[in-house]
Amino acid sequence: NSGGSLRLKRAVEAKAAIEEFPDCPERARGRGFDLADYVKNGTKEILEVIFGAKSGALITELTASQTMFHAVGTIMEGVDWGKNAVTSALEHPSAHDAVEYYCKKTGREFREVPANKVTGGLDPDEIMKYVDKDTVLLSIMAASNISGNIMDIKEIARRAKEINPDIYVVSDAVQHAPHAVIDVEDWDVDVCNFAPYKFFGVRGCGYAYVSDRVAVMPHIKLTCKDDNVWALGTPAPANFAAMMAVIDYVC
């Protein structure tokens, strides 16, 4: 389903039903409260059920790729230490290029770990050759739709933090989400994303988890909102309704 070929009918129906309400979830009245509940409950279920998060914040964008650029950019521009960032040759372009782009923008060295040409995966031993005490960020995908490999993100994160306890670990879980459990707490990562349309859901939305320490970094937000709020503008309750339909189906 790497191209989103499987879609849950109930997700489409849920989205269509909510889109029929021409009201705003930020209005203080009955229907507005009902729509706001979809956003509140949907955010909670995505963070807790999909990502396995006990805390942190949710980034919402039109695509998962946008969430990756948003999160990586926030870290790379918000951290004033470190001389390099690491990703791999196996990454989706949005994860790979986000690291490359912000390395150029912040004047840091861009390091790329090669894939294992025999297994098609990424070896933790090889990854650690590229990580040092000056590595700000390490971005490694959870699973590859090209080779079919599932990476041991928990082990990779653990070993990277043995080298540099302050490193930020990012994992693109877009291809992983429909096939295996995501557990950001167990993995000990700071950023993780997925695309609903590749997980039986609808197009036009992408979601990312960010850890507590990333959530409060300076980022684009309204002045009066709390430091850990990433939602910007009127939310789309229908997208949350569609994702909750997927969660109900899968879980």
Each model region followed by its residue ranges:
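Pyridoxal 5′-phosphate
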Residues: 1-251
